[in-house]
Swiss-Prot record:
Family indicated by similarity: Belongs to the leguminous lectin family.
Extracellular topological domain residue ranges: 32-287
GN (gene name): LEC10
Chief location: membrane
Descriptive protein name: Lectin 10
Pfam family for this entry, one: Lectin_legB
Source organism: Medicago truncatula
GO biological processes: response to symbiotic fungus
GO CC terms in record: membrane
Length: 287
């Protein structure tokens, strides 16, 4: 009898230990899962960094709106037909969902940031094409405005696009069509422009899209230095005869943007068309 009780006690103790270990295991994974969920729900940080070498259709970090789609690992900002021919009057946007802390209200400090991406804009060998695309920083809740197709690049509408109106948007535009508010010189059209609070570029430089081979790969690098407050843009077409295009401006982001922003791409076509494809994208910011 004593031996039987001893075996029963050992079995019971072993079972209790097993249950305890399983309980700890489940509790650990529950906490880990909960922590992961909470961080996903509130993904705010002083530093953000990512690198996308190929776009995935089910990427939870990228939110697509309008006519933007992902196919064959490419982010296609505006609509095309089945043969890849661009369609008129389309508007598309892709937003990276994690908020970016671009400046701090308490300390007054500004963030440094840099981003790079490769892109292809196919003009179908026509000098008449449009409208363009832009990399932008904007408010957390920034919907696509109504009447923002064509030259408004899906970022502005006719009521808030021009000075003295100051929309809380910073954009680097790749503008393929000359509107009445664009640089007057034919040398500067198409152009790469820095838009600070309006669709009228504060600074701009020539975009050689009409002179590079069809489907040429462009590479853009955009950097912001918090000490000098200088935003610098470098665009090149490797393997072609064109040197890099450079444009920069001094801008205090505290006077333009809210503390927290989201980043992304926006693009449009009008009656004239072109493709707007982003091949890869990386970004890094630190406050």
């Amino acid at each position: 009898m004593a031996l039987s009780n001893l075996k029963s006690n050992r079995t019971l103790s072993s079972s209790l230990i097993t249950i305890f270990i399983i309980s700890l295991f489940l509790q650990y994974h529950n906490i880990k899962s909960q922590s992961s969920w909470q961080s996903r729900q509130v993904p705010r940080s002083e530093t953000v960094a990512f690198s996308i070498t190929e776009f995935e259709k089910e990427n939870p970090d990228i939110f697509l709106r309008g006519d933007t789609s992902i196919s064959d690992g490419i982010l296609r900002l505006t609509k095309t037909d089945q043969s890849g021919k661009p369609l008129p009057n389309t508007v598309g946007r892709a937003t990276y969902l994690t908020p970016i802390h671009i400046w701090d209200k308490t300390s007054g400090e500004l963030a440094d940031f840099s981003t790079s991406f490769s892109f292809i804009v196919n003009t179908n060998d026509s000098d008449l094409h449009g409208d363009g695309f832009a990399f932008y920083l904007g408010p957390l809740h920034f919907d696509v405005p109504k009447n923002s197709s064509g030259g408004y690049l899906g970022l502005f509408d006719p009521e808030n696009a021009f000075p003295p109106s100051k929309t809380p948007i910073l954009a680097i535009e790749f503008d393929g069509f000359t509107n009445e508010w664009d640089p007057p010189s034919s040398f500067q059209s198409p152009h790469i422009g820095i838009d600070v609070g309006s669709i009228v570029s504060l600074e701009y430089a020539q975009w050689p899209i009409n002179f590079v081979p069809r489907n040429a790969l462009g590479e853009a690098n955009i950097n912001y230095n918090s000490e000098s407050k200088r935003l610098s843009v470098f665009v090149a077409y490797p393997g072609t005869q064109w040197n890099s295009t450079r444009v920069s401006v001094v801008v205090d982001l505290r006077s333009v943007l809210p503390e927290w922003v989201r980043i992304g791409f926006s693009a449009t076509t009008g009656e004239l068309v072109e493709t707007h494809d982003i091949i890869n994208w990386s970004f890094e910011s630190a406050l």
